């Protein structure tokens, strides 16, 4: 298996029915120890040989065991460890393969067969040999937007790639596909067997050995500059018809989880499981919700004064205007709606930016932005053993 996101891999997965069926089958195909051994490739490349030639189904089971585990901690050093180990493994397989077929890799490539006669000698002189593959220029730029095109031969809207170039582009696609898949599994993580939490525990141990610290995103002061576009739009105030969804459903759930419990261990968590003082809600979260409600046209609480009780209900305190912390659990603390639901119920709020393509929920958008910001700051600080090592391949 050259790429777990390829068409060939998708055909194998279809034999199990749905992705949920495959995930439930994984504990019967592989064990926790061999899955954890796989991520150790990141620090010991000698382990590669034990994984290069394994059977396709077993390979997919090990890989999806890691993705399922990451759904409980989608952004952190665990993600970087899984990326690094699997990029090393799959790129080595691609490197050893004599010829790459389009169905074996998650890039829309073709065999390079068309070269203008006048360019042949120049191509061989500049690149050493004729490029073997082509990819459409638009896809290339989407994956590697900052790449210098002058270093590639481009003809008829296609970028010509040698195998080493192909691997570079593939790595970018692979990283994006991992994030997308983890975000997809994030939505169903409460349905996964306990096996995946065991795997996550093992990944965390290896990550701490490899990077020397924990990279988990924790609760803290809100960063509005890192909020997703839909939340920023809701904070500006919305017209009648969108008010209840934008304020009570989206903002209430997003702001509360983002501030109190950005990476909840489960969906049925209660506010009192995460904080000891209700003033975090009354002094930090509720004012933001009320300000956004007052910016609506007309202001939400002017014609719906009881909607404040509904906000507390969505926070898990029951239908009340004056709750105490111990009331937490009287109703469900609503989780932020996913992107599909926002698009369906309030399409005006959905104005995607470049980060949105990686996520499926506004909360994971925020987690991702927080993590990337932390990684950038750590890199600036010259953290030799920590974040800088994450980026080494």
Curated annotation (Swiss-Prot):
Gene symbol of the encoding locus: priL
Necessary cofactors: [4Fe-4S] cluster
UniProt GO cellular component terms: primosome complex
HAMAP family from the UniProt entry: DNA_primase_lrg_arc (MF_00701)
Annotated residues for binding of [4Fe-4S] cluster: 230, 339, 350, 356
Cofactor binding mode and count: Binds 1 [4Fe-4S] cluster.
Family designation: Belongs to the eukaryotic-type primase large subunit family.
Function: Regulatory subunit of DNA primase, an RNA polymerase that catalyzes the synthesis of short RNA molecules used as primers for DNA polymerase during DNA replication. Stabilizes and modulates the activity of the small subunit, increasing the rate of DNA synthesis, and conferring RNA synthesis capability. The DNA polymerase activity may enable DNA primase to also catalyze primer extension after primer synthesis. May also play a role in DNA repair. Displays gap-filling and strand-displacement activities.
One protein family per Pfam: DNA_primase_lrg
InterPro entries in UniProt: DNA_primase_lsu_euk/arc, DNA_primase_lsu_PriL
Assembly information from the UniProt record: Heterodimer of a small subunit (PriS) and a large subunit (PriL).
SUPFAM superfamilies according to UniProt: PriB N-terminal domain-like
Name of the molecule in the record: DNA primase large subunit PriL
Coiled coil start-end: none
GO BP, sorted A to Z: DNA replication, synthesis of primer
GO terms assigned for molecular function: 4 iron, 4 sulfur cluster binding; DNA-directed RNA polymerase activity; metal ion binding
Keyword list, A-Z: 4Fe-4S, DNA replication, Iron, Iron-sulfur, Metal-binding, Primosome
CDD domains xrefs: PriL
